[in-house]
């Protein structure tokens, strides 16, 4: 409150103010238990967050023995069922066992560490998978991503057929500049024609098949297909690395993560490439599913048809059946019989009118009787054949 207002308006008694503040949240809770109070929940969440997070798959990189992370993960999963989460240790639990020399408290703490690491690892993997699904679903729903992925795949196919082309090499450098991250994707694109980049070509083929070609699939089905492809590729290359059917779960998860991040980077790159499109591409549908033309669209189409050039239709052969042949041009009223008897005497003239139309005129060299019975000079009779707009 402003000091001026504080002087003008008397404050209530301090006792009443303290009672009102202390009873406010209690009335809102409706007499609920203290455990569900907002302040108690905030304190509890802060205490839980104070426990350092541990990830069995990614902590202490390069310091664990091969296969030990897999054993820790499976041990935490098995101990989680029978591990008491709210057990209180007393002084008797710290006594050493005469059989193995390990106290119950020590075993409980070690199992608690394994269970906690397992739970944190599962939570991190679930969050990463959920984030990946949301990102992929958002990206493949954009039309720019579909167009950009189609262009990227088509360019890669053309570059593999002709890797020495200077024009394609210039386009390759332009595409690489759109990569936002410095990493494996940029290096593999620069060496896309080399054998070590074959994995990227396979991934592009799969994404192009799922996102571009399979137009009948829903967005959720495309996300599921992409996840299936990622898992299949991860298992294939993981077995190649270890040369065995058994692959530690942590290594398989890391290879899977690599492919998932690469998929997101390719879709983001496709989005950047598809933004250059200026015209909207409409999907071709059958005539039975097309919406009928309204009056405004019908009049617009009619105006285009009236103002279009008819010569293009004649030259295209659409109305070639309606055009009479040269032999029939002379048959008709007003034309001499010489047009049929002497077809070599026919001549044609094309004239362009001031209004832009074209007129075709026929010149007929007819025969007229001379005064002395001979043939006179060839006379010309004109007949306008038609106007084409």
Swiss-Prot record:
Keyword flag Phosphoprotein: yes
Keyword tags: Host nucleus, Late protein, Phosphoprotein, Viral genome packaging, Viral release from host cell
Compartment list: Host nucleus
Renumbered residue ranges of the record's region Interaction with packaging protein 1: 1-131
Regions crossing the membrane: none
PTM text: Cleaved at different sites by the viral protease during virion maturation.
Pfam families: Adeno_52K
GO BP, sorted A to Z: viral DNA genome packaging; viral release from host cell
Induction, per UniProt: Expressed in the early phase and late phase of the viral replicative cycle.
InterPro entries (UniProt xref): ADV_PKG3, L1-like
Compositional bias ranges of the Basic and acidic residues kind: 362-374
Signal sequence interval, chain numbering: none
Principal location listed in the UniProt entry: host cell
GO cellular component: host cell nucleus
Stretch list, region Disordered: 350-389
Function recorded in the entry: Involved in viral genome packaging through its interaction with packaging proteins 1 and 2. After proteolytic cleavage by adenovirus protease, L1 52/55k protein is removed from the capsid during viral maturation.
Additional record remark: All late proteins expressed from the major late promoter are produced by alternative splicing and alternative polyadenylation of the same gene giving rise to non-overlapping ORFs. A leader sequence is present in the N-terminus of all these mRNAs and is recognized by the viral shutoff protein to provide expression although conventional translation via ribosome scanning from the cap has been shut off in the host cell.
Family per record: Belongs to the adenoviridae packaging protein 3 family.
Subunit description: Part of the genome packaging complex composed of packaging proteins 1, 2 and 3; this complex specifically binds to the packaging sequence on the left end of viral genomic DNA and performs packaging of the viral genome. Interacts with hexon-linking protein IIIa; this interaction is required to promote correct genome packaging.
Record's protein name: Packaging protein 3
Species for this entry: Canine adenovirus serotype 1 (strain CLL)
């Amino acid at each position: 409150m402003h000091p001026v207002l504080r002087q003008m308006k008397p404050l209530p008694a301090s006792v009443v103010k303290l009672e009102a503040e202390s009873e406010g949240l209690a009335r809102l809770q409706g007499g609920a238990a203290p455990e569900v109070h907002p302040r108690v929940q905030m304190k509890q969440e802060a205490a839980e967050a104070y426990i350092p997070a541990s990830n069995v798959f990614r902590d202490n990189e390069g310091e664990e023995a091969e296969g030990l992370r897999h054993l820790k993960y499976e041990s935490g999963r098995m101990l989680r069922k029978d591990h008491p989460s709210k057990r209180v240790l007393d002084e008797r639990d710290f006594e050493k066992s005469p059989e193995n020399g390990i106290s119950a408290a020590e075993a409980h703490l070690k199992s608690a560490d394994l269970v906690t690491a397992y739970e944190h690892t599962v939570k991190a993997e679930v969050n990463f998978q959920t984030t990946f699904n949301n990102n992929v679903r958002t990206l493949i729903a954009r039309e720019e991503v579909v167009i950009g992925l189609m262009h990227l795949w088509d360019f890669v196919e053309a570059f593999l057929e002709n890797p020495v082309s200077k024009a394609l090499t210039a386009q390759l450098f332009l595409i690489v500049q759109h990569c936002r991250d410095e990493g494996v994707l940029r290096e593999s694109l620069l060496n896309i024609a080399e054998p070590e980049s074959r994995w990227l070509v396979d991934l592009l083929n799969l994404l192009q098949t799922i996102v571009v070609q399979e137009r009948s699939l829903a967005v959720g089905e495309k996300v599921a297909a992409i996840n299936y492809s990622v898992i299949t590729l991860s298992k294939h290359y993981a077995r190649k690395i270890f040369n065995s059917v058994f692959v530690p779960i942590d290594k398989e998860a890391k290879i899977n993560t690599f492919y998932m991040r690469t998929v997101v980077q390719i879709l983001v790159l496709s989005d950047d490439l598809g933004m250059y499109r200026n015209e909207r591409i409409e999907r071709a549908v059958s005539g039975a599913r097309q919406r009928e033309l309204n009056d405004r669209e019908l009049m617009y189409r009619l105006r285009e048809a009236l103002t279009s050039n008819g010569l293009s239709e004649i030259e295209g052969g659409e109305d070639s059946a309606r055009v009479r042949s040269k032999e029939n041009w002379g048959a008709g009223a007003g034309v001499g019989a010489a047009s049929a008897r002497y077809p070599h005497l026919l001549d044609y003239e094309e004239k362009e009118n001031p209004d832009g139309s074209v007129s075709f005129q026929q010149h007929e060299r007819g025969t007229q009787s001379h005064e002395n019975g001979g043939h006179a000079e060839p006379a010309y009779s004109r007949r306008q054949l038609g106007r084409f707009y």
